[in-house]
Amino acid sequence: MKLRRKVYMVAGYNTISMGTGRSEFHPKKPRPDLEDYIKEAGENVLSEIGGAGNVDECVIANFIASRYNKQANLAAFFPYIDPGLTNKPCVRVEGACATGGLGLATGIKSILAETADVVLVVGVEVQNSVKAVYGADILSAAGWYKERKDGHAHFFPGKFSDRAGVYFKEYGMEKTRQAMARWYYNAIENARLCPTAQEFENSQKNLEELALTEPNPRLFVDHLNVYDCSKVSDGASAIAIVSEEGLKRCGISKKDAMEVVGLGQAEYDLTRAPEVPLRLTTTEVAVKKALDMAGISRDQLATVECHDCFTIAAIMAIEAIGFAKPGEGSEFILAGNTSREGKIPFNTTGGLIGWGHPTGATGVHQAVTIWEQLTGKAGESQVKIPARKPYAMSVNMGGDDKTLVSLVYKKC
């Protein structure tokens, strides 16, 4: 299956990923609200595409503001961004941590359906509005909430700790822990180059040594420490999805755009445990669909944004994409392949661990990061995009490998 119409992304924008680690953040002092992030991200995209009058449709991606912020009906914030968006078709989408990816997929399908030539997509989440114990309960809705009562107090860290335990037993703990620590090191080093990253100001030394801190099951989970986990984040990301007609309407050159050439979506039963805890099998399906639609192999990818909600998830994602065989993802990382100078740079602004994880924004942030890379707008975060490898991929995962969106992009 091929895309039947040219689809592009342009004018990406990220707010700061706010939370612990940023000097601006203080849990007891005023800080931006949900609508502030929506407005900042949306306005900045509109300023690059010629204004609200050029927009046909709008999509807002948000996981669960109805609990974090007691706010629903988020699509109605688009006219708040700009009165010129009043009476435009607007919709809100949700799919746990893959919400942003679903927002992108929704916009892409509007372009393909020819109901729109320009779609504004905004992903947003504000999560530092509640104490951690309540936040853990809210986030558990990304899984099957009926498991919450008998599940781990730290619901999702517990899920991926269980996966890590199985992985350690099958493939060896020492090597895997070293790779998890290296992943953390790379994430922070990349975040230090990106001014909007939550870990931009991280000045810790001996990052790998820190990341090898022994897990404390009494205080947290059995097989992960806090450095293995993405943080709680507030922020928004936005991008415009356009047709060729939309490019002309917005006055944007193709050199400032990237083309979408592959889309893969997959879903797994929320009520069922993973059949193969050692693998991200739903991720495998979505990635294959995206690569098949693009008509390329993974070896043609210049960079990848993967969903590293936990360091063990990054190792398993590398295997799911096919860069390493099952059990060999650790060696792939330890050989330097995923670093900035490596064979295939991953998560060049820090990923979920380094840049941050404002849940509904994450999939959109991945697309913005890749747009910056493929158009040469990444600043200090820029990596080489060889002429023979003009493609990139994002993989956005919701829940414990339940909701997946993978996209393949091409440099214009």
Annotate each predicted stretch with a short phrase.
Residues 100:
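Short conserved active-site loop signatures built around small residues
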